[in-house]
Amino acid sequence: MLGRIRPFVRYSVFRAGTYRTLFTSPYRMQISLIYNLFATCNSCGIKLQNENPSKPGFYRPPSARPKLVKPEDESFNRLMDGLSVEDRKLLLNSSDATLPQPVTASTAAATTTNTKKEGDIQCIRCREAMYKSNFSWDELPVESIDKIMSTIPPDGNVVYIVNAVDFPLSLNRSIFKYRNPSQITFLVTKCDLLFPSAQLSNRYGATFFKDYLSRTHGADPEKVFVTSGMIDWNMKDIIKALPDNSYMVGGVNSGKSTVIKSLLYTMEKSKPNYLSSKQQTKLEKQQDRMINSNAVNRHQHTKSQRKVEQKFKMTYGPGTSYMPGFTRGHIVHDIDGKTIVDVPGFSANESHGIYGYLDPSTIKTLSKGVKVHKRGMYDSLYESVRNGQVLTIGGLFYLATPQNAVYQIKNCINHKFHVFNSMDKAISILQTIEKNKALENVFLVNKQSLDKLQKFIIPPFYGSIDLVIKNLGHLNITPTGKKIDNEPLVIYLPEGVEAIIRQPLTRYITRSLAGRDKNGNPLRKELWKSKSVTHLQRFNGTTPFASLLIPSTGSDNLQCISEYNSKLNDTPITYDNNTHLDESNKYKYWVNI
């Protein structure tokens, strides 16, 4: 029995910005008591233990022995002890009249014994990962959304972190089984990859994501925010909007912990900055140098500010990593007097998905993404793929084009693609990669990825589409030239890799070509780039935004499309070489998500 429930109390400060709390709700009280009864890793949230190195949460307790003092430091302290206060100030070039007393070697040894707070302790796994980049998949667990949501109390407010890079594939609709969409706060992260500035993100990005989430799922537009945890976009507004007792949930590598670090840093910056006389003197000298200098280097100033920010984020808040499954338990934070809980990420199938085929350095590179506002626009560079050629990015997928067709491809994934003449050629090269050293850098995966290769058909489309690969990014695909037949694009995916198609995202988040001249007259497609005006298209929810891929069950792709759609709609639907797609029926064969 928990006994009588006491009023709301905060206690047991472990580190700046992090605490454990006692709540009035019995369920929340039980969760909070667990947080306080056991020491947890301040980086991943797992319960700490120092008995079995092979079990999760192992850590080495701080040593009780005095810290080793270098002979040079000991000599320095001894000499400083013999100086007067005035001589000490002169030696240190300081005008501070209230200099602290020098620390001797013996004093330093005494004060450094057992100074590490319990809340600052990290498990061995986190230290190995952060300081040595040593990772083990066994220590990077990924849970299902059902298991993660079962750890959140019924009265906990859910804040859903959604990755903008692979949207809407990053939005797991199973969460609506646990909370009404109108009660969820949505934070769309990594928007710095879509927009060059926070102003454009707020102007165009926020409009689209609010439209989509409200019209498709019934979310409250006032609870939808666009942000970037890397460069702290809109964090002040988010802090004001976040309800107390919030639980940050989202897919693996969606950026939950990065957002929390950004929130903590924003709170730190908002605090009054009271300088000591020594700090004030140092600041005045810096200002004098900047005023008297002929050329003030703004880049150096910005760089120094970024270093301060990075140091703070490395010191405070949860641990972050490009490896999936880094957070392993609840980590509670105090942000502006509100309880914010970092929760482990989830996956649809409790697997590492595409990450399982990659090594840590490759994951780090791919996770950086690319600037879509540079690489994915209507006037961005493209490459053409045609006549049965197969495009691959590291062997993570194989996109096969039909004969007698040409496609323009814009790559918004942080790795170069390679084009093979056929699927058979691509497979044979990977299977004998030891004999093809010149093509080693083409593949990011090994030959075992071919063991369970799955074939999917891309639903018929009219105009451009985005092919979205989960946790990677997307390719923008535009068919060109005269169409001979209706053979579709085919994609081969290793087991666990997820993909969908969607309408081009840039259509809704940037001003794109309207297909009309300044007088409103329609233009031929070849004249669009030279004479078309631009416009911003709003998502109205009347057309499908995205579609699942169609599983291939035979060699006749057209028949597979017909049979799958007929079964899905419970009515006969035919797709063959006589089918004509245009604006009126271009989404007829899409499989709504």
From Swiss-Prot:
InterPro entries linked to this entry: G_CP_dom (IPR030378), Mito_lipid_metab_GTPase (IPR050896), P-loop_NTPase (IPR027417)
Keyword annotations of the record: Mitochondrion, Transit peptide
Domain of life: Eukaryota
Domain CP-type G: 142-349
Keyword Mitochondrion attributed: yes
UniProt record similarity statement: Belongs to the TRAFAC class YlqF/YawG GTPase family. GEP3 subfamily.
Name by which UniProt lists this protein: Genetic interactor of prohibitins 3, mitochondrial
Gene giving rise to this polypeptide: GEP3
